[in-house]
Amino acid sequence: MLSLYEAAQFRVHDEEILDEALKFTTTHLKLILPELSNSLLAQQVGNALKFPIKDGVVRVEARKYISFYQQNQNHNQVLLNFAKLDFNILQMLHKKELCDITRWWKELEIVKALPYVRDRLAEVYFWSLGVYFEPQYSTARKILTKNISMISLIDDTYDIYGTLDELTLFTEAIERWNIDASEQLQLPSYMKIIYCGLLDVYDEIKKDLANENKSFLINYSIIEMKKMVMAYFQEATWYYGKTIPKMEQYMKNGISTSAYVQIAATSWLGMGNVATKDSFDWIVNEPPILVASSIIARLLNDLLSHEEEQKRGDAPSSVECYMKEYGVTKEEAHIKIRNIIENSWKDLNEEYFKVNGTIIPRVLLMCIINLARVIEFIYKDEDAYTFSKNNLKDVVYRILIDPII
């Protein structure tokens, strides 16, 4: 039954039998779980109900599976030892990467200069690690971590700090993408720090890519950064104009504010020859698999963070947009949005089966899949990115610091 439950998670649209199979297995696994006591099977069922394989962050699930396998009386000790050794060796590499990035972050002195931003470097690195953990993608992970860190600063600035006039200037500066723009537009001092830091990060990335004669690929990431910032600015105009847009308008803008189109394009930088110019041309056209991943990211973020954001003063989320447009309660809006997320997972599964091995290599598609998995993990029960001192902090410690003995 557990295997059927896991398999049914990969269903696509119009697969009514698998829809029924998922409902059936979910119901019965929940019913039998209390009767399994503290057995190994109980642990596996409990974990699967919360994090099915479809949603699992690979390194997190690998650590859990090693523990499950060790408890199996029929385990192969040689295989178990090898799995532990492999995990710990990779963990040492990941720890070194995080140390290198932490040094860069501290040199920026961002937190001291911008006290309103979320200081979440370890969590951002975990995000990148969820996209790809393999040793050959070390450079790509560093690039992606720095990129997401800068996005987080920009997001916080648009959400909670910048005035509309200041955000207008910053949006124009991003559009110009020139170091002189900060002085020409007379950006506020705190925005100059972000702007110059962002351009410095991209200069570093360009140098890294120059070694492979691929520095031109950075332009794809810059294009998506501009689109994302423009979408953030659109949200700011809604907030300051006290406007609640229609759901369709919100979702169109939300593809960009999820940041996942930009992050996906940037995640391929540093991956070597597997990411070709044709691949980047494909991704910036927002293929359905990427749109699905972006919708999942946008809506999960909204569901778990909208109440806190509305308290402090922020643009309307999908919840507020849906409530106003259709005249429903918050609970009804949540149910509808959960359905949209579920359908987006079906879209994502379907597009993966279509595209895999035909247009885009599997390793690149898995970056998009894994981005959806990470967002599912971080926003499963709470906004664990904003409130990271809860469960996420413990997970980051187990994955990056604590070796398997």
From Swiss-Prot:
The gene is TPS16. Belongs to the terpene synthase family. Tpsa subfamily. Keywords: Magnesium, Metal-binding. This is Sesquiterpene synthase 16. InterPro entries: Isoprenoid_synthase_dom_sf (IPR008949), Terpene_cyclase-like_1_C (IPR034741), Terpene_cyclase_plant_C1 (IPR044814), Terpene_synth_N (IPR001906), Terpene_synth_N_sf (IPR036965), Terpene_synthase-like (IPR050148), Terpene_synthase_metal-bd (IPR005630), Terpenoid_cyclase/PrenylTrfase (IPR008930). SUPFAM superfamilies: Terpenoid cyclases/Protein prenyltransferases, Terpenoid synthases. The keyword Metal-binding applies. It comes from the Eukaryota. Mg(2+) 2 binds at residues 155, 159. Binds 3 Mg(2+) or Mn(2+) ions per subunit. A motif (DDXXD motif) lies at residues 155-159. The lineage of its organism: Eukaryota, Viridiplantae, Streptophyta, Embryophyta, Tracheophyta. One of its GO terms (molecular function) is magnesium ion binding. One of its GO terms (biological process) is diterpenoid biosynthetic process. Pfam families: Terpene_synth, Terpene_synth_C. Pathway: Secondary metabolite biosynthesis; terpenoid biosynthesis. Sesquiterpene synthase involved in the biosynthesis of volatile compounds. No activity detected with geranyl diphosphate (GPP) and farnesyl diphosphate (FPP) as substrates. Mg(2+) 1 binds at residues 155, 159. The Asp-Asp-Xaa-Xaa-Asp/Glu (DDXXD/E) motif is important for the catalytic activity, presumably through binding to Mg(2+). Its cofactor is Mg(2+); Mn(2+). PANTHER family: OS04G0344100 PROTEIN-RELATED, TERPENE SYNTHASE 16. Mg(2+) 3 binds at residue 309.
